Structures are given as structure tokens and as C-alpha cells.
């Protein structure tokens, strides 16, 4: 398989939008400060934009698959209106942690599926997220560059870069 493309794998809640816990309605969805600039920067550099998100609220009964699909449609329409493009792919896990599925981050299967479908070279790509599970999913998939958005730096033996805001992430992505 030819893997010529590079990707920005990104988490949704906490990266694209402010994480208010189980966000499922557009009224509760607020874009994170700096996300438009980050997406525009990476798209200009030729990165595929691939959403990798755990959405256990579906199987926990907090919202329906249809709610998730409608919010995703709103997200895509908003990006198209604001930036002139939208995400290249959306990959999600609907399972709760106790279901012990194969797709929930920190397991790498969603990233690997997206990489296969979009011919992604993981060594030229980035995973960005706001939780340790996001970073571990990137590491487990062998994504070379992992950027963690955090106000409280973690002491970790892992090779991810910790950033205080999305603007700082832009500086790392070349």
C-alpha cells in the first residue's frame, strides 16, 4: 500500500470544541479558540484532517447515534462555511470503557483504519488531543508526532509534546 499522505488526527471534545461533557446538541457545541487557525494551517500544508473520537454517550444512552450524526453534520457545515473545507474523515467509537471493544482510544484501531483508507504515512503525521488516551492511541498506532493540549503538564516517560493552547500546536506542525 502506498502511504504518501500525511494527516492531522484530532480528537473532538476538548480540541475541536469546548468539552462540556457528552456534547450532543449544536446548542451546546462551541468551537475551541484557535481551532479554525489550526485546521487552516494544517490543510494549507497538505495534511488530511481526520477526526478520531470516543463517543461513549451513545451506548450509555445519553444521546443517540442520530444525535451524533446531526451534530457531526453541523460541525462539517460550520467548517465549510468558515474555512471553505471540512474534515476529510470521521472515525468514532460508541462504546463505553467497560465494553472492552477494539476501537476505543487508547487502542489504535480507529487511527489505523483512517490511515489505511486515506493512504497515510504515520511517520509524517500528528495526533492531537487533550487526554492521555488520545496520546496513547497515537503512540499505539505509531504516529510519530503527538501533541497534548493541557494546562496542567503531565510527568510522563512518553514522547509527546505538551502545549498550552492550539496556537502553540500550530508552531509544531510544519
From Swiss-Prot:
Positions of the record's site feature: Contributes to substrate recognition: 104
Example of a GO biological process term: ADP-L-glycero-beta-D-manno-heptose biosynthetic process
Binding site for substrate: 11-13, 19-22, 53-56, 104-105, 131
Keyword Hydrolase: yes
Site positions for Stabilizes the phosphoryl group: 53, 105
Annotated Mg(2+) binding sites: 11, 13, 130-131
Transmembrane stretches, start-end: none
Superkingdom field: Bacteria
Quaternary data: Monomer.
Listed name of the protein: D-glycero-beta-D-manno-heptose-1,7-bisphosphate 7-phosphatase
Organism expressing this protein natively: Helicobacter pylori (strain J99 / ATCC 700824)
